[in-house]
């Protein structure tokens, strides 16, 4: 019997990026859902129970940090990968303190994100991963 595909929620207001990520993830056997701001993302996390979330930091209405703050420390929260165009190391440190499994700066190689997704689903954090995009 085939294993049920893992569900990934992408929360990002950049529709082109969301479609590119959707295509790549579906090609690798994942089921993909999407939300376009933090409010929609929070609702989808509660209602759809994704296995992993890819979360943008900067979005209209509600960005990624309030979502991270809301789910911080909750044992039933899915692993979250934050993606951002922000270069600040303080932002990365705060996101890590809030519990992200990885923090990836845009633009990024799709392979980099796919590796982070695979590690996140296995329960491994970015701390064990090679830091190839560390431009502090």
Residue ranges of predicted features:
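Alpha4 helix (beta4-alpha4-beta5 surface) of REC/receiver domains from two-component response regulators
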Residues: 66, 87-102, 115
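Acidic catalytic/metal-coordinating carboxylates
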Residues: 36-40, 62-67
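Non-catalytic signal-transmission and effector/linker regions of two-component phosphorelay proteins
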Residues: 1-7, 111-136
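Charged docking surfaces used in two-component/phosphorelay signaling
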Residues: 19-27
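Short amphipathic alpha-helix used as the core "switch/output" element in two-component signaling
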Residues: 43, 65-76
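Receiver (REC) domain active-site loop signature in two-component systems and cognate sites
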Residues: 59
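Active-site beta3 strand of CheY-like receiver
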Residues: 48-54
